[in-house]
Swiss-Prot record:
GO molecular function: preQ1 synthase activity
Protein name: NADPH-dependent 7-cyano-7-deazaguanine reductase
Keywords for the protein's UniProt record, in alphabetical order: Cytoplasm, NADP, Oxidoreductase, Queuosine biosynthesis
Species, as recorded: Rickettsia bellii (strain OSU 85-389)
EC number: 1.7.1.13
Length: 273
């Protein structure tokens, strides 16, 4: 089944019975080809961090339970799962009786692993779990006075650099693109760490703004930005982390790094999450 003839982007009927066939998988290679990326020789390491805030089920006595579910899809997976299909799938547990939270976790992770063709890991957190908030690390470039006229498609020729080597961390809250399926806006905060030729901050901001009317999945936007910066400055080190705001009770936060021994970014939520 393709995106065009799937139920995605159309009016949906929510099922109240557990149904793993609701998950809709999409090959990563379809979007990576355009970027010159092949799955067996990835130029990055990393993970897609998903936070699902609307998980609910029934316990053995029929009492509703609610929780937050965080899971991690490795970049080495051959497929991703479309976010609306994940929402529909998770909602199919709403009237489903589960013996324990651990059993529920095993079921969901197995279904996600089956669809992504990779080992998906994750945890279910009680709704009363204490959550820490933070702010983006690094230098914020949003207040630079620039004129913008390009809002899509993304224009990598806007990236400029200086012939001086630096190690720095930059962030912007102005990243926006649109969902490839629904056309709804995806708002994101991006954190860029690198060691190499100094990126011109004003030019980088113009480049990020050029995603504004772009229709791509969150994962593809992250890989496009990573690839474009890598091709522009050939850095010794580069990492990209995009924290998207939630839509439909789910947020997706892609992380890409040249370091195979990367550590996951801080789990602190930003104010827009």
């Amino acid at each position: 089944m393709t995106l065009s003839n799937s139920a995605l982007g159309k009016k949906s009927t929510y099922k109240d019975t557990y149904d793993p066939t609701l998950l809709f998988k999409i090959p990563r290679i379809d979007n990576r080809k355009e970027l010159g990326i092949v799955n067996d020789k990835l130029p990055f390491h990393g993970v897609d961090i998903w936070n699902a805030y609307e998980l609910s089920w029934l316990d053995k006595k029929g009492k509703p339970c609610v929780a937050i579910f965080t899971f991690f899809v490795p970049t080495t997976s051959s497929h991703i799962v479309e976010s609306k299909s994940v929402k529909l799938y998770l909602n199919s547990f709403n009237n489903f009786v589960v013996d324990s939270m651990e059993e529920l976790k095993r079921t969901i992770l197995q279904d996600l692993s089956n669809n992504t063709h990779a080992e998906v890991t994750g945890e279910i957190f009680p709704i009363n779990t204490k959550i820490e908030f933070g702010s983006p690390t690094g230098i914020n470039i949003d207040d630079i006075d620039i004129e913008c006229s390009e809002y899509g498609p993304p224009n990598n020729s806007l990236i400029k650099h200086e012939d001086v080597l630096v190690e720095e961390e930059l962030n912007s809250n102005l990243l926006k693109s649109n969902c490839l399926v629904t056309g709804q806006p995806d708002w994101g905060t991006i954190i860029i760490k690198y060691k190499g030729k100094k990126l011109k901050h004003d030019a980088l901001l113009k480049y990020l703004v050029s995603f504004r009317n772009c229709n791509e999945f969150a994962e593809q936007c992250a890989e496009r930005i990573f690839t474009d910066i890598k091709n522009a400055i050939n850095p010794e080190f580069l990492s990209i982390y995009i924290i998207y705001t939630r839509r439909g009770g789910i947020d997706i936060c892609p992380y890409r790094s040249t370091d195979s021994n990367y550590t996951l970014p801080s789990s602190k939520r930003l104010i827009r999450q």
